[in-house]
Amino acid sequence: MVAPGSFLACRSLEQIKVDVAYSGANVKLIGISSGISYGPLGMSHHSAQDVACVASLPGIEVYVPSDAQQTRRVIRCICQSTAPAYIKVGRSAVEDIYTPQDELSGMTPHGAPPTGVLLVACGEVTQGAVQALRRLQEAGYSAALLDAVSLKPFDQDTLL
């Protein structure tokens, strides 16, 4: 099911909880234009809490891909699974960070393990985090970025 994230995740939460999460139904939900990307349409279209709402439900996987390539890989991955899943995708077109050959990982590292700054990002904001990483490294800081595409299950081993 594809729908604006503000309506899919929040207004339909009770149905998702009962009909998808509790029953373990093989349902894939895609929340488009989530967050505040519908800005001019007002607060009724904002959905900053959609990931938190869906992630609070048992048995549902939650993904927030950073670009079109990663979105394609996430969709292929969840279609091979019978677990319920929610994907949050942004509204804006962003430059690809990944290539079609890159493998999907719950948390993708960029840069060497840092002794200084560690950035963690997901979704559309990863583009800005990549730029921040470059600036930090150019300024001589030891910095790295983890792109957390999988929020549930969360890859805490890579983070730690």
Regions found by a protein language model. Give the residues of each.
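Conserved thiamine diphosphate
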Residues: 1-118, 143
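Generic recognition of short, well-ordered alpha-helical segments
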Residues: 11-15, 130-131, 157
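Short, surface-exposed alpha-helical segments at coil->helix boundaries
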Residues: 48-51, 126, 130
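A general structural motif
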Residues: 96-106, 118-129, 148-157
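Short helix-loop-beta junction
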Residues: 128-146
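N-terminal small/polar loop signature for handling phosphorylated ligands or for N-terminal nucleophile
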Residues: 160
